[in-house]
């Protein structure tokens, strides 16, 4: 396979494809945020950061505004203590939050749901959100002037049929109304100084059940995870997610609800996510919302305990970021960067607290992100993803091989470029491979740069 790079051709900016969710911290030890800074991670989405049932301390509305009957205009009604430490640390390390206004998932809600009910007064809930924003952006209640841009209204209200949803016990229509009331109030208060959006869609897996109807391939890839997702796509839960999506934007149009960005989630493979991104963009254009920013702000294409810290995980993460750079999607946030025993926590070893190889896929992308301008690439195919960036005389390229075999590659890269290999045995280890001709093994990544 011959891959050609043109560092004189500028095709746009390198987008923030290497954001994360659940930033890495232990207790209130935020020193692990240094890893985010080293990788130039651009955003940390604040959802599920509070621990089980919100943990009682961080971010969630019930953790900040503990008594819903209290006066929402009184600073004494708010408990910003722990959330202040978290948000301040993120800002200190140069990683602003995407602030989710809502609650943490309640995984065992079938026993009892605590905070995932619709607020009993949507207008008051919107005013509570207003004062949280004023605290972090306007200094209200001994607050800050952080200029946080992205404010997301709730998370995955579509995640399950009524009675089964771990995020939202209300009806679809109740969420639409909550979004409408809150978005209108926040935009009235803050105008263009903030961006308001949602609804953090749980996913679009079911479109592959009717490929002709939705304009997608019957099967974009065939790895084990994609096969599992195809089975999941047949479930009533997955079908409800799609119905919710169409109904949400129909409501937005009918009610003139303001929305600056649409957020969605996926745990599918790279090839499927590429197709989903195109589907989302087509739908938004059809709805009359083609101008919206879009965020894939919860994704993980190796969410299994046996895949954490493997070459498969790091290569697929790098491939996802390279692939989505070439889609319309504006921001990606990987789920997640926590330090803990979770199948989703793919960046850090929960025993040693050290980075897994997958973290270095984000660090490698960060090298291109710092350069700023995307450069021309041609010739990558068949499960090999390539991306390039340039800044004046500085050049860098990233290649990920997630195909079913080793890739024999030739390029027009100068032999003077240094190569750094990434897999579960090499954490961006410098290699003596000739950049003009080399073999990139299955599930390997290489970063090449001249600086």
Model-derived regions, located:
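Mature N-terminal, pre-catalytic/accessory segment of carbohydrate-active enzymes
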Residues: 1-35, 39
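Conserved, mostly hydrophobic/aromatic
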Residues: 20, 90, 132, 151, ...
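Substrate-binding cleft and catalytic face of glycoside hydrolase catalytic domains
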Residues: 39-259, 265, 269
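Glycoside hydrolase catalytic-domain groove-lining segments
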Residues: 253-307, 330
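Carbohydrate-binding surface patches
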Residues: 380-415, 422-425, 443-444
């Amino acid at each position: 396979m011959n891959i050609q790079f043109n560092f004189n051709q500028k095709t746009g900016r390198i987008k923030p494809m290497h954001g994360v969710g659940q930033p890495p911290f232990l207790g209130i030890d935020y020193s692990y945020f240094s890893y985010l800074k080293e990788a130039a991670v651009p955003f940390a989405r604040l959802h599920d950061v509070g621990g089980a049932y919100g943990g009682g301390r961080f971010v969630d509305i019930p953790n900040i505004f503990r008594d819903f009957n209290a006066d929402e205009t009184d600073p004494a009604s708010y408990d910003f203590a722990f959330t202040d430490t978290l948000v301040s640390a993120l800002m200190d390390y140069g990683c602003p939050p995407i602030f989710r206004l809502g609650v943490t998932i309640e995984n065992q809600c079938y026993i009892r749901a605590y905070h995932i009910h619709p607020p009993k007064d949507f207008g008051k809930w919107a005013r509570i959100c207003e004062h949280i924003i004023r605290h972090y952006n306007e200094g209200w209640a001994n607050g800050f002037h952080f200029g946080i841009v992205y404010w997301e209204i709730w998370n995955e209200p579509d995640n399950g049929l009524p009675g089964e949803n771990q995020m939202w016990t209300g009806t679809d229509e109740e969420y639409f109304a909550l979004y409408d009331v809150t978005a209108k109030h926040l935009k009235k208060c803050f105008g263009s100084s903030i961006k308001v959006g949602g609804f953090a869609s749980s996913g679009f897996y079911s479109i592959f059940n009717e490929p002709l109807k939705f304009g997608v391939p019957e099967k974009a890839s065939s790895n084990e995870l994609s096969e599992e997702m195809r089975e999941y796509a047949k479930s009533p839960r997955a079908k409800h997610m799609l119905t919710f999506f169409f109904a949400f934007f129909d409501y937005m149009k009918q009610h003139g609800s303001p929305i600056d960005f649409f957020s969605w989630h996926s745990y599918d493979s790279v090839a499927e996510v590429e197709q989903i991104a195109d589907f989302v963009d087509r739908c938004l254009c059809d709805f009359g919302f083609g101008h919206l920013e879009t965020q894939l702000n919860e994704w993980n294409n190796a969410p299994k305990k046996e895949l954490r810290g493997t070459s498969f995980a790091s290569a697929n993460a790098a491939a996802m970021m390279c692939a989505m750079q070439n889609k319309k999607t504006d921001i990606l946030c990987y789920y997640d960067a926590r330090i803990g025993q979770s199948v989703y926590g793919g960046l850090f070893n929960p025993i040693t607290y050290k980075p897994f190889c997958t973290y270095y896929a984000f660090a490698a992308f960060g090298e291109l992100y710092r350069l700023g301008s995307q450069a021309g690439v041609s010739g990558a195919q068949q499960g090999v993803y390539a991306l390039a960036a340039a800044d004046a005389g500085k050049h860098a390229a990233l290649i990920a091989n997630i195909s079913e075999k080793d890739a024999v590659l030739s390029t027009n890269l100068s032999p003077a470029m240094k190569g750094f290999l990434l897999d579960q045995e090499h954490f961006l280890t410098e290699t003596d491979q000739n950049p003009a001709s080399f073999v990139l093994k299955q599930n390997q990544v290489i970063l090449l740069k001249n600086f």
